[in-house]
């Protein structure tokens, strides 16, 4: 911790870190690899069993060949593997010493093994301990190479003579870093002992022990060869890298490369790493909208379809004036040389055509070319297409086609390219057969052939039967044929004025009887449906204004059908019994005690101008509400008196002259059965309660002695906080002097009992006692403070109460105070 607090130490550590970092940048790249190395410096000590248990045959056939295999697989040299050989039986003998003959050369070692195979015969016992001690002596004398690995290989077929001694020497060699391996050959090998001798567990795998028959001796040596030739991890320096090249791209992510020369086969000569210089500018993405623009013109091509009906090539549009076939039509009737003119007037077969039974109606029409009834043909309901043919002459075909495309379809089903229905030269005879006009008929307006227009595209098969038709002499009749004078029969064209029977055709206005579909206007008699205004007959429902006849509900005033009872509008709510009497006589107050609260007074009997005469009322009989003069008055239930501290008692009415006072009034109010209210301190009348069992008498009370009004005056309720039991009204008789008030001692005593006594005396006494206590406390505190301060100043002054104790007794007292517990008498 002290070092961490030392700034110099921290500075030195920082410098070391920087230097290591800089040196690390200059170090060559290194790679780690492993390879099998058999040329390491190893000293192999071979201990060969030459006891008689092996036998000469095994010695010659198996033992010596196994040693030759081991030598052949080792890299024996002066610097790498050195070999020593010791033969043990009863005694041990070192055949090859380390760094001696045959120790560093394979050829020398093979020669020794061949001589041993031919000249030695196994004999004696197994003295393994003596051979182990030879190896131990080499280690102790440092006859080995300190950098070399020490390995001892034992070849035996039996159990050593001294097991404990042999085991002890093996452990001693292991402590000196000598590895021991055993190869057991033959039938008498003790495997358990050999495993313990090597240092392996009894049942665990042991790499330093191998056993088997003599035939397997050469195979058993191979595991030991792997121990000698081990894989060693090595580090190779691959060389220094060159500088990094520039990034492969000028923007965004790229790669850079560096190279070096190969110094080892496992090294890499080239290295790449990602790099990034800067972000590349974003390339604007072409808008997608221009790609959609060519698709949009395809939409306008859709309305091209409505123009298809106006296509001049449309064969279904007979009304197109631009029909290229029409201009050739007018030339056909003007051609006098036309041999195919079916309208030859000399044609005798034409009259037979009207006999065509397939069209019985057509012969009637051509017989009268000027038939004014032709205009009625458009009215033929069976052929509504007829009126459509003349109309294209007078109407705009473009206007008519969209409105009625269907009427135009029947004529175009069999269009005639030679049809003179060209609007430029109308044929006056077309109305003769408006159903199927024949372009060649105008040549003979007088005798049209109705059957020819039945198939205008194909000539009448009867025409070739006309012998006169090839005769051109009739063609001079074509002077008639050039019925151009008949073209002035265009005056017959004014028969088109008959065609303006199309005004009858505007019987289609009868078709616009679809306006009669606005008979829905009759349906939209919804104007009549706005009879919903009649539904708002709810205005009649707003007869609810009659419902607000709820003002008639205030007919509840009529509910008090007792007009006599409400005849006194001044009668108050019967729930307030005290107030209803006030309006009864506003001039003279009424004593509420004289009234029976249980018997409501009749407002009709009360006279606001006259006081109530108690004699006129029958005091003996209670007022019966059923005896009221007006039977319509509904009497209220009797109201019991209630306590109301806010009500000021009203002085009684003093009867005037002519009024008799009841004679049964007591002279002293205390003797009366009537409970007189007495005010409390709070201003409440304690006697005016529901618990009172006394009632106002209904019988006349005898008047007192000389003063007939005294008894009545004694019934006056006492005002609030008054000590007088008798209060006289000044309005009784102003001439009479007020009588002296007689106090009631009993009432005073009762009132004083209810009042709480004043606590002022206790307050004064408490104040005096508190003051004295404060003074006493102040004096005691002063004496205590003065005594303690004086003792501190005086020093060795006597303690308090010390002068009280005699001098002779002071020592005794002090001794008594400082006695030990065991010295006490009570102990």
UniProtKB/Swiss-Prot annotation:
Sequence repeats lie at residues 603-613, 614-624. SMART domains: TSP1 (SM00209), VWA (SM00327). It is a single-pass membrane protein. Residues 301-388, 465-567 have a biased composition (Low complexity). Residues 709-724 have a biased composition (Basic and acidic residues). The keyword Repressor does not apply. Keywords: Cell membrane, Disulfide bond, Malaria, Membrane, Repeat, Signal, Sporozoite, Transmembrane, Transmembrane helix. One of its GO terms (cellular component) is plasma membrane. PROSITE patterns: TSP1, VWFA. Residues 43-228 form the VWFA domain. This is Sporozoite surface protein 2.
